[in-house]
Amino acid sequence: RGNGRINAKEAREIAEQKRQRVGLKPEISELFPSELSGGMQKRVGLARAIASNPEIIFFDEPTTGLDPIMAGVINELIREIVVEMGVTAITITHDMASARAIGDKIAMIHNGIIQWNGQITDLEKSNDPYLIQFLNGSSNGPIKLTS
């Protein structure tokens, strides 16, 4: 899993396989990052993340900057790949739609402390005031905003 050296030909073959897996057309290989749309950039990032067949994949705000439709497409792609590869995914996100779409377990961290954790299906059942405030997007509650 990603700890051996490969030659240039093998690297190109892997890049081609991963490009196809994330649904990008061959022409994309000739473009600079600045020439790609936000959704294409996210797909390229995902292809790079899976190129070495990792056991764990970290996602940091995977849908930031995307419209809701493209965010849904990226969420579905992440979920498919995680299941297909049988890997562990750790995702940092403020996007609860994304968290619900790709997560099985979730933890809410506030001021560096795990405030709540559990199954994604238990989110709405929680009585934790921090979680309730966050889910509702309320300014009232234990989470105080600082300027």
Residue locations for each model-derived region?
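Catalytic Walker B motif of ABC-type/P-loop ATPase nucleotide-binding domains
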Residues: 57-60
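Conserved catalytic motifs of ABC-family nucleotide-binding domains
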Residues: 53
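Conserved ABC ATPase signature
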Residues: 32-36, 40
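Helical segment within the ABC ATPase nucleotide-binding domain
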Residues: 72-85
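A short, surface-exposed alpha-helical micro-motif characterized by mixed small hydrophobic
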Residues: 99-101
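Conserved ABC ATPase "signature" region
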Residues: 9-27
